[in-house]
Amino acid sequence: MQKADFIDRIVIYVKGGKGGDGSASFRHEKYVPKGGPDGGDGGNGGYVFLKANPNLSTLLSVSEKKKYIAENGENGKGKKMHGRNGKDVVIDVPVGTVVKDFETGEIIADLDKPGMVVCVARGGKGGRGNVHFKSSTMRAPKISERGFEGEERKLVLELKLLADVGLVGYPNVGKSSFISKISNARPKIANYPFTTTIPNLGVVTVNELQFVVADIPGLIKGASKGAGLGNVFLRHVERCSVIAHIVDISGMEGRDPVQDYFDIRNELEHFSSELAQKEEIIIANKIDLISKEELEKRLEKLRKETGKQIFPTSIITGEGIEKIVYKLAEIVKESKKFHTQSEVVNEQIKRPKPLWKELPERFNIEIIKEGNDFIVTGTYVEEWAKRLNLNQKDGYRKFMELLEKNGLEKKLKEAGIKDGDTVWVAQRAFEYKE
């Protein structure tokens, strides 16, 4: 048994892989002196997915990394060989995780069933190889496209926690002490009624199993009708696997543990018949405060009157705690197995189209003048510069033709350019000549 940090809200960065670049290769084969273009397309970038895993109860494992980046697509190759697609990243999150966009707050997904999958970052599409650019006027195109960048965003993951174990019992029977002993929860503990005013949630790890324990506060006689605080908090345990009912077996406060049990049991039945039918164990706390003879008498009476399995313990000394935790883990594991089989959504990972943007051949050009320097800019100027490989002869030529077609010369003259001034295009400098 180990204690697990409880984390229910995190921010992560996700990015799809970049598409691979297309190839600008040519056939080089014996007896084929003028082999044509044979450059293959780049592979698509990998995607990032979130998947609801019923075996997780906290976002701790996800929070250990801040960035999740899928693999880039492989570049295209000769012989019309496509590059390999980048590997996806699949992030397991607990069932009940709500996914929001960090910037807008928009809810992207509510992963409320085991096995649900959502794509949160698409990979970029691979660039085209030079086989796509062959034409009657360009028989040997030395041009290819660069792959498109993958989608990137920041996400907020929030966990709507569903308790696996609901702790019930009168105030001061030791619920808060018990949950702090077995988990990471650290409730304020004092000896007066209604000490706990919000549900304390703790995460316990037993071997590979994580489960959530909720300490339901203020549950007293009349709670189902709104007395105390119980009516508000009973909802937190409606979907739990097991009710752990803690009683003060010592009776030090003058109450009868058997009567206490039936009082609380009655409230559960009034609130929800479904809740009342859940598996239940009774934890008889404060065994260190009475003699062994008196303890045996009281335990026997409790067993006989309730017909339930009784687990004697002293939360203060720790006696009997481990046995209780392993019993709870056994019940939760069986319940999870049943619910997972009945509720699981066997979703195949659906891959939307990779990220890609068709660029128009007609667009606006802007000129920024800084002394004798004239910087050519504009949204599509930048995007075409990224799309085409300007180190390739025909790629550079196509880029300059696009600029000329969209009035580069006219724009420069309107900006007051003179012979000998410097023109900057895509981080390259040229001397302007009339």
UniProtKB/Swiss-Prot annotation:
It comes from the Bacteria. GTP binds at residues 169-176, 194-198, 215-218, 285-288, 314-316. Pfam families: DUF1967, GTP1_OBG, MMR_HSR1. Its EC number is 3.6.5.-. The keyword Nuclease does not apply. Residues 163-333 form the OBG-type G domain. It is found in: Cytoplasm. InterPro entries: G_OBG (IPR031167), GTP-bd (IPR006073), GTP-bd_Obg/CgtA (IPR014100), GTP-bd_prot_GTP1/OBG_C_sf (IPR036346), GTP1-OBG_CS (IPR006074), GTP1_OBG_dom (IPR006169), GTP1_OBG_dom_sf (IPR036726), OBG_GTPase (IPR045086). Residues 355-434 form the OCT domain. GO terms for cellular component: cytoplasm. GO terms for molecular function: GTP binding; GTPase activity; magnesium ion binding. Gene3D superfamilies: GTP-binding protein OBG, C-terminal domain (3.30.300.350), GTP1/OBG domain (2.70.210.12), P-loop containing nucleotide triphosphate hydrolases (3.40.50.300). Its main location: cytoplasm. Keywords: Cytoplasm, GTP-binding, Hydrolase, Magnesium, Metal-binding, Nucleotide-binding. SUPFAM superfamilies: Obg GTP-binding protein C-terminal domain, Obg GTP-binding protein N-terminal domain, P-loop containing nucleoside triphosphate hydrolases. Its cofactor is Mg(2+). Residues 4-162 form the Obg domain. Signal peptide: none annotated. It is an enzyme of class 3 (hydrolase). NCBIfam families: Obg_CgtA, Obg_CgtA_exten, PRK12296.1, PRK12297.1, PRK12299.1. An essential GTPase which binds GTP, GDP and possibly (p)ppGpp with moderate affinity, with high nucleotide exchange rates and a fairly low GTP hydrolysis rate. Plays a role in control of the cell cycle, stress response, ribosome biogenesis and in those bacteria that undergo differentiation, in morphogenesis control. Belongs to the TRAFAC class OBG-HflX-like GTPase superfamily. OBG GTPase family. PANTHER family: DEVELOPMENTALLY REGULATED GTP-BINDING PROTEIN-RELATED, MITOCHONDRIAL RIBOSOME-ASSOCIATED GTPASE 2. This is GTPase Obg. The lineage of its organism: Bacteria, Thermotogati, Thermotogota, Thermotogae, Thermotogales.
